[in-house]
């Protein structure tokens, strides 16, 4: 029924590999930036905290094409980062996906951090724990929620099409290997060609990846303390 047999195996493996590479790199970068933000915001009460959390939540709804356009302008030859010549490269795609995945990761991990009981933090402080000790304790207690945040961000990144199409250029070489074409942009190409069955086949692969990520996320959500009476 589906036209997977019509696809070059090299092409199929290549676009899947690019999708996984770009999404994984974007989530890793988002984690490096986002987890410290989640801990900093979750640990402290400060003036304007509600505004910060509102901005983070709003960021989850960033239109991907707008993000792609902004990154395009920044990386273009006349843009501030034009000298690095990153436009239409996997690195440009990673940057755009990081911008989209970061608010998701921060928002979900912040909720996990804030769900750790204050009494637990106070007890650790009373026992002589340093700020680092308390931070590590909170991370350990919120670990399932943090993993859920990582998986949610990954699902956001790997299903992205608008921004990666703008900044990546959807480039594939003559030997059928992909440079910046992903599963999502390949589906767009096949749909425009009228190859609906091939597009559906690629969509099935993408859907399987997303469902796998969501299944892992659901598993960790169920193991988060306070949910369904289960926890550690």
Curated annotation (Swiss-Prot):
Signal peptide positions on this chain: none
Q: Which UniProt keywords apply?
A: Cell membrane, Membrane, Transmembrane, Transmembrane helix, Transport
Q: Which SUPFAM superfamilies match?
A: MetI-like (SSF161098)
Reply yes or no: does the keyword Transcription apply.
Answer: no
Q: What InterPro entries does the record tag this protein with?
A: ABC_perm_TupB-like, MetI-like, MetI-like_sf
The UniProt transmembrane annotation reads: 23-43, 55-75, 93-113, 146-166, 198-218
- What sequence ranges are listed for the domain ABC transmembrane type-1? 16-217
Q: When this gene is knocked out, what is seen?
A: Mutation within HVO_1886 or HVO_1887 causes nitrate respiration deficiency.
Where is it found, in Gene Ontology cellular component terms? plasma membrane
Principal localization reads membrane
Query: Pfam families under this entry?
Result: BPD_transp_1
The UniProt entry's GO biological process terms, in alphabetical order, are: transmembrane transport
Membrane-topology annotation of the record: Multi-pass membrane protein
Q: Which Gene3D superfamilies match?
A: MetI-like
Output the superkingdom of the source species.
Archaea
Q: Where in the cell is it found?
A: Cell membrane
Subunit structure comment from the entry: The complex is composed of two ATP-binding proteins (HVO_1886), two transmembrane proteins (HVO_1887) and a solute-binding protein (HVO_1888).
Q: Which family does it belong to?
A: Belongs to the binding-protein-dependent transport system permease family.
Q: What does this protein do?
A: Part of an ABC transporter complex involved in anions import. Responsible for the translocation of the substrate across the membrane.
Q: Cross-referenced NCBIfam families, in alphabetical order?
A: ABC_perm1
| Protein name stated in the entry | Probable anion ABC transporter permease protein HVO_1887
